[in-house]
């Protein structure tokens, strides 16, 4: 199932956490500092003004998307970008030109999680032999940051999950 281009909120699901769109709370992807900074997360509800434009990127392949922040004032700080070679590094919010200059890439594979819950997805970065790099959340310098986590492709290993919900004005 693919995404329609549109505005969404992106909620990190901790291991064992189940999504509930009726109860605000949890760690929502944000970028309170603007562009060229790591993507962070804040404990905000779905009524938050943080919104992400998720759009197909057919040139990058099937189920590949860009994730771009739009602010209330309609400014666009940038897109989720990741290193094409490094793992366990923060996901940055770069504009496309900056991403191309640094060698970082902007497309992500967003695929349904196998937990049977609607709206629960994996956000996948680099794919290498024997492992895949997944977007996850960790505490870094006193604040939660989105980062790339290598997870071996073996049974019963926890894979980071995100609840992606259509943004409502």
From Swiss-Prot:
<keyword id="KW-0646">Protease inhibitor</keyword>
<comment type="similarity">
    <text>Belongs to the protease inhibitor I85 family.</text>
</comment>
<keyword id="KW-0789">Thiol protease inhibitor</keyword>
<dbReference type="GO" id="GO:0004869">
    <property type="term" value="F:cysteine-type endopeptidase inhibitor activity"/>
</dbReference>
<comment type="function">
    <text>Inhibits papain and cysteine cathepsin endopeptidases, and also inhibits cathepsins B and H, which exhibit both exopeptidase and endopeptidase activities.</text>
</comment>
<protein>
    <recommendedName>
        <fullName>Macrocypin-1a</fullName>
    </recommendedName>
</protein>
């Amino acid at each position: 199932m693919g995404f329609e281009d549109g505005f969404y909120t992106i909620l990190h699901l901790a291991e064992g956490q189940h999504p509930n769109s009726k109860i605000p709370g949890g760690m929502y992807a944000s970028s309170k500092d603007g562009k060229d900074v790591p993507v962070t997360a804040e404990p905000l509800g779905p009524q938050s003004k943080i919104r992400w434009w998720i759009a197909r990127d057919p040139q990058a392949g099937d189920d590949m998307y860009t994730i771009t922040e739009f602010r209330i004032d309609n400014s666009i700080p940038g897109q989720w970008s990741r290193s094409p070679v490094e793992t366990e590094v923060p996901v940055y919010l770069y504009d496309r030109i900056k991403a191309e200059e640094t060698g970082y890439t902007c497309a992500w594979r967003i695929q349904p999680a196998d937990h049977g819950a609607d709206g629960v997805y994996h956000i996948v970065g680099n794919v290498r032999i024997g492992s895949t790099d997944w977007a996850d959340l960790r505490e870094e310098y006193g604040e939660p940051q989105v980062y790339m986590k290598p997870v071996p492709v073996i049974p019963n290993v926890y894979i980071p999950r995100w609840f992606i919900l259509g943004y409502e004005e």
